[in-house]
Swiss-Prot record:
Subunit: Homodimer.
Species of the source: Vibrio cholerae serotype O1 (strain ATCC 39315 / El Tor Inaba N16961)
InterPro entries cross-referenced by the UniProt entry: Aminotrans_II_pyridoxalP_BS, Aminotransferase_I/II_large, HisP_aminotrans, PyrdxlP-dep_Trfase, PyrdxlP-dep_Trfase_major, PyrdxlP-dep_Trfase_small
GO terms assigned for molecular function: histidinol-phosphate transaminase activity; pyridoxal phosphate binding
Disulfide bonds: none
Top enzyme class: transferase
GO BP terms, alphabetized: L-histidine biosynthetic process
Protein name per Swiss-Prot or TrEMBL: Histidinol-phosphate aminotransferase
Similarity field: Belongs to the class-II pyridoxal-phosphate-dependent aminotransferase family. Histidinol-phosphate aminotransferase subfamily.
Matches recorded under Pfam families: Aminotran_1_2
Database matches in PROSITE patterns: AA_TRANSFER_CLASS_2
Residues with N6-(pyridoxal phosphate)lysine modification: K209
Length: 346
């Protein structure tokens, strides 16, 4: 049957998510999931009826949280669907181009390839910042520029001044898509305040990380109302299951927000524990991170990754040479990981 698929799909290498890679262990620090398993109440009523395309209570709750108007919010099945919607809505196949800056999240390229949209890569600088002159030189036919901050997998923040310069250089030419999946761990670095000034800005958000709802598959796109209305033309008619909307509203309630804030602080302490503990291991370099993960460079990254895997500690290998991404888990998971790595290098 594969021969019946589009040629681009036949040649496509799918994104290897943490779940697809698999593994077996008792310490799972490979998918940037939260270690907190929070409880929610839903009576599963009205399941015989379709949900609203954009549930009003859910949209209003996230608008209040993000500090925008409801008409500036679109919800989707995770931020990944937001990526696809932007590409489908704004890029002509075999004509338009997306631009992204590796090393970064892999789904920008795969989503574009799936829809027959060309990809341009402008690598980040040696300190993992935007190479603005090279981006400007490559803007021909580009409709979307994807920027991840905090960046996955490096963990760093992209300079705000550079984001503004990028928005300026792409005005009336392209949309800058800020992937803020991890911004809840450093909300002061958000670009949401720039929406009022730049109609070519779109922001991707998710409840998967700081809100500990990866299994809910609930994401948001923030933008000006005109851009949101374009996305509403291509989104599925019933993208949000009723229980998802109900749980999201609870997570965004005052009590839910207070809990998320506390858990973010707890993860920040565990991240600091990981950073200090691993930095004391000879030959190991820990890069500063602003999300719920750290990028760590080892003398032999692939070997360390495999040894941890065999020991039941599941980490995430990286396209960056000798680097491994380690999610921030609970304190016990962090302690086990640091102890294993210390013993490995003794």
């Amino acid at each position: 049957m594969e021969k019946l698929a589009r040629q681009q799909i036949q040649a496509l290498t799918p994104y290897l998510s943490a779940r697809r890679i698999g593994g077996s262990g008792d310490v799972w620090l490979n998918a940037n999931e939260s270690p907190f398993n929070n409880e929610y109440k839903t009576d599963f009523a009205r399941l015989n009826r379709y949900s609203d395309c954009q549930p009003k209570a859910m949209i209003q709750a996230y608008a209040n949280y993000a500090g925008v108007q409801p008409e500036q919010v679109l919800t989707s099945r995770g931020a990944d669907e937001g990526i696809e919607l932007l590409i489908r809505a704004f890029c002509e196949p075999n004509q338009d181009v997306i631009l992204f800056c590796p090393p970064t999240y892999g789904m920008y390229a795969i989503s574009a390839e799936t829809f027959g949209v060309e990809r341009k890569k402008v690598p980040l600088t040696t300190d993992w910042q935007l190479d603005l002159p090279s981006i400007e030189a490559n803007l021909d036919r580009v409709k979307l520029v994807f920027v991840c901050s905090p960046n996955n997998p490096t963990g760093n923040l992209v300079k705000r001044a550079d984001i503004i310069k990028l928005l300026e250089m792409t005005q009336d030419r392209a949309i800058v898509v800020m992937d803020e999946a991890y911004i809840d761990f450093c909300p002061e670095a958000s670009t949401v305040d720039l929406l009022a000034q730049y109609p070519n800005l779109a922001i991707l958000r998710t409840l998967s990380k700081a809100f500990a709802l990866a299994g809910l598959r609930c994401g948001f796109t923030l933008a000006n109302a005109e851009l949101i209305n374009v996305l509403l033309k291509v989104i599925a008619p019933y993208p949000v299951p009723v229980p998802v909307a109900e749980i999201a509203v609870q997570a965004l309630s005052p009590a839910g927000l207070a809990r998320a804030k506390y858990q973010v602080l707890d993860l920040g302490a565990n991240r600091a524990y990981l950073q200090v503990g691993l930095s004391m291991v000879p030959g190991v370099q820990v890069f500063e991170g602003w999300g719920n993960y750290l990028l760590v460079k080892f003398p032999d990254g692939d070997a360390l990754f495999k040894a941890a895997w065999e020991h039941g500690i599941i980490l995430r290998n990286s396209p960056i040479e000798n680097c491994v991404r380690i999610s921030v888990g609970n304190r016990e998971e962090c302690e086990k990981t640091v102890a294993f790595i210390r013993n490995y290098y003794q």
